[in-house]
Each structure stands twice: as C-alpha cells, then as structure tokens.
C-alpha cells in the first residue's frame, strides 16, 4: 500500500529538483499535482525535438515578421505598458521589462487566431530596454511550449536554454520547453522586442 505512494512522490521530486529549483514550488496547493503531470509529459516527450515546422501554421508567424513589426511600431506607442512584476511575484520591480497583449494588434491577432496550435491566453510582445539579466527560471507547467519571434533586436540579447544559446536577432524565432531551464542576458542599450506565443504540444 505505502509503496504505491512512492510513484507520485517520486514524480513530484523529479519535477521539483529540476534546475533551477523553484523556491515557490510548494506555495500553491495544486503545484505538486502539476509536478506529476509534468513528469508524465517529460516521459512521453523525452526525445521530442521542438521544431517550428512540426506545428501546422506556426511558420506563418515568421513569414509575416515585417508586417508584425510594422503594426507593432505603429500601435505600441499608443498603448499603456503592462509590467511583468505586476502579474508575477517572481519578477522584481523593473520598469524596463514590460509587455503589450496582442489583442491590441488586430492584424496579428487575426493571424494568430487562425493557427490552431497556438494558445492565445498569454500571447504578447515582451519588451526589454537596456542591459538586463533575467535569472534562470522555468514555467510551472510543461503543457505548452514557448515560441518567440524577435521583432526588434540587434544581437545584444541572448536566451539560454538546455539546447544552448539563441541570439535575439530581428526575424529569428525559437521554440522551446519553457518549463525547463532558461535565462536571458542582455548586454546592450538597444530595445529588444519579442513576440511570445504559447504552443500546444
């Protein structure tokens, strides 16, 4: 009987002990249950490569980079900035790290809604101004993958994942499991803008 408990406990421990360890892991009652689900998905998708072309329609985002950038440049200056530190206690107060929801960009929003593999609940343009380090972290759930397309970036900003370094240059994209280790290091003063989308596995 007690031996049966070892399975879920082991699955929770496996998820909890992933690098970097999430210090807020046990602050939510449902998080251990998410840990079991995460471990189960890790077992199923252990050898999966995250390639954009394997997700129907996702390639269209990069193809429309120029139009997306033009719409961002036109509309973003008219919008109020939303700050990550206001929605997530993990982030320290930082007025140079903010976002705009894509619902405010009608052409992009129309395109995204046509691509069935995209979950639009957190779809946004993420903006980093000036030098910045976002320390190693990971999402609570691995149910969704994270897609990023660089709208503005001159190469002074890099995203590090378990697969290595991705340099944020205009028009370049990446798909990765954001429930595993990733961190961001930006060394220059230029503004970096990325389109962030969550993608169903």
Model-based region annotation:
Residues 124-126, 150, 160, 185, ...:
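Residues in well-ordered beta-strands of folded domains
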Residues 127-132, 149-155, 180, 199-201:
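Short, flexible loop/turn elements at secondary-structure junctions
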Residues 146-150, 175, 190-201:
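A short hydrophobic beta-strand segment most commonly corresponding to one strand
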Residues 151-170:
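A short beta-strand-loop-beta hairpin characteristic of the jelly-roll/cupin
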